[in-house]
């Protein structure tokens, strides 16, 4: 009798309180292997697998990640996105605090600009980004201005002035993954907000 060797697979989620089901994918069919809660280490033999991630609270969009085990241990990082329902809930919860901080420093945003999109980011829903476009005036270029805030010590702090382009060079103290996700999700061409 031949026993297939197994390898340690370390699965790490980018957010807390997530669970997942692991399926073996033979190409012809998939069969459930196990379920996990939170970051886990499991033993798997060589083959192709699918991890289907979810949250009991509905805070993330369900996510499928495919990976293969080929003769060695593997580290699998699972990146998830907040669900629209969760983001809407958090934005509504934070709106008055964010607006107070933002419009106190940049009153022209309230009077001369129109909010286009807003999102919640970060592993702990502690980043906020919004895009604004100048209201209807003769010189409206159509440019979109983005502003980013972070919740620090239970207070929202402005991390960027409203500007057209945010990069690692013209912003400080903003992780590259937050900048990248802000740019892709607030783009006027983005289908996921």
Model region roles, listed by residue range:
Residues 79-107, 123, 127-129, 161-193:
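Low-complexity, intrinsically disordered terminal/linker segments enriched in charged
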Residues 44-57:
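A short, solvent-exposed beta-strand micro-motif common in secreted/extracellular proteins
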Residues 21-39:
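Short, acidic Ser/Thr/Gly-rich low-complexity loop/linker segments typical of extracellular
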Residues 4-8, 12-20:
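Short proline/glycine-enriched turn/loop motifs at strand-loop junctions of beta-rich domains
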Residues 32-36, 56-83:
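Structured interaction patches on ligand/partner-binding surfaces of diverse proteins
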């Amino acid at each position: 009798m031949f026993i297939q060797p197994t390898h340690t697979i370390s699965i790490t989620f980018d957010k807390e309180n997530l669970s997942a089901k692991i399926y073996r994918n033979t190409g012809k069919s998939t069969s459930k292997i196990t379920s996990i809660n939170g970051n886990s280490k499991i033993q798997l033999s060589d083959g192709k697998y699918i991890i289907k991630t979810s949250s009991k609270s509905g805070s993330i969009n369900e996510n499928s990640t495919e990976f293969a085990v080929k003769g060695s241990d593997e580290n699998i990082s699972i990146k998830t996105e907040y669900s629209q329902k969760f983001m809407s809930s958090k934005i509504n919860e934070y709106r008055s605090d964010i607006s107070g901080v933002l419009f106190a420093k940049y009153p022209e945003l309230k009077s001369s600009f129109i909010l286009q999109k807003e999102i919640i980011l970060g592993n702990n829903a502690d980043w906020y980004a919004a895009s604004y476009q100048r209201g209807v005036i003769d010189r409206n270029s159509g440019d979109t201005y983005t502003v980013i805030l972070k919740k620090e010590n239970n207070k929202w702090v402005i991390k960027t002035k409203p500007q057209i382009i945010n990069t690692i060079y013209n912003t400080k103290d903003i992780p590259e993954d937050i900048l990248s996700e802000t740019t892709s999700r607030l783009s006027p061409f983005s289908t996921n907000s």
